[in-house]
Amino acid sequence: NPKGEAVYRLFVKAGSVMEKENQRGLAHFLEHMAFNGSYHFPTDGMVRFLESKGAKFGKDLNAHTSFNETVYKLQLPSSNPQMVDSTLTILADWAGGLSIDSMQVEKERGVILSEWLSKKDAKRDSDTAFLLELLNGSRYSERMTIGDTAVIRNCKREDIQDYYQTWYHPSLMAVAVVGDINSEQIKTLIKEKFGKLSSAASPTWKQCHIPVYKKEAVRILTNESLKTIELDMIQLLPLSKPVQTTKDYKAYLIRTLLNRLFKMRMNAWAFENPSYKKASIQYSSFLNATGVLLCSVELLPGKMEKGISEFIAQQ
C-alpha cells in the first residue's frame, strides 16, 4: 500500500445462502443500505464524509455480497489519527449500527432493480446457466445473490432488519487493517468500537453441500449475441484439505503446478495447431462446499469438432 494509507475490511460470514424464502436478495439489499444511513452517519452522510476526504466510490469505498459472505472495503489515508478513528467508527456502524430507514429503503429499491436489469444480457444468462449446473440443485442454486425481484419490489424495512439482526453477529465477523498504521492504536480502537456490539446468542448455521452428479449430463446454451464458443467440462470432487501441514502444502503446490503445466501445454498446442483459441484445466475449492475440476476450451468457428477432439485427446 502507498505510504500514509491503509486498507480496511469488515468480513461478515453471511450471504445469500442464509436467506429465508421471503428474504431472497436481502443480503445484497442490506449491503446497499450500509451506505444509506447509520448511527453516526445519517442518510448519505457516510458517503459524503468519505468523499470529502478524497475517497472515490467504487475505488476506495466498496462492498460485495456472495453466497457465504459480505465484505465491506475501504482504502483511506492513515496519517491522521482522527481519520483512522472515524474509519473504524464506519466499520463498527456497518457491523451493528445501520439505520435501515424506510425512505432510504424505497430509494435503494429502484437502484437495485435497475442494477438487476442492467446485468441481464446474453453473457450474464450464460454465466448463470453455467453456475446453476455447478451448483447442481443444492440450496445455493435457490439463493442466487441478486435474489428474487418480487422480494426486492415488496420487502419492508423490517424484513431487511430481521436479516441484519440475525446474521450480523460478532461471532460471524472479522476486521482486518493493513498498511501504514500504528498496530497498537488500531487494536485499541477495534476493541473500543466493536466491544459494544450485541452479545446475543450466536445464530446457528449448517454448512451447505453440493451433491455430486448422479449421471453424466450435457447442457447446450445458444444465443446469437454471444461472441465466443466455449466447452466446459465439470467434475465435482471431494473438497481438498485446508493447508495446515507441510504435507497439505505439498499437495497444494502439486495441484497448482499441474494446473499451470496443463495450461501451458494446451496453449502451446493451440499455437502450433490452431483448432481452438485457448484452453485450461483447474482444480479449486468452491464455496467451501465441494472441489471442482473445470476443463474449459474456447473453440474456433468452423473447427468445433476438431477442437473438441484435440482438447479431449490432450487430457
Positions of predicted regions on the chain:
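Mature N-terminal segment immediately following signal peptide/propeptide cleavage
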Residues: N1-F11
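Short, solvent-exposed loop/turn segments at the edges of secondary structure
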Residues: K3-E5, G54, T65-E69, K107, ...
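A structural supersecondary motif
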Residues: K56-D60, I234, N259-E298
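An aromatic/glycine/proline-enriched structural segment found at the starts
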Residues: G137, A174-D232, L237
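Extended catalytic-interface subdomain
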Residues: L74, A95, K227-Q235, K241-R260
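Histidine-acidic residue clusters that define the catalytic metal-binding segment
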Residues: Y72, A129-M173, S183, W205-H209, ...
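Active-site-adjacent, His/Asp/Glu-enriched structural segments that form or flank metal-binding
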Residues: V12-A27, H32-D125, N154-C155, D159-L172, ...
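Short acidic/His-enriched helical or mixed secondary-structure segments at domain edges of catalytic enzymes
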Residues: V111-F130, H209-I229, A268-K277
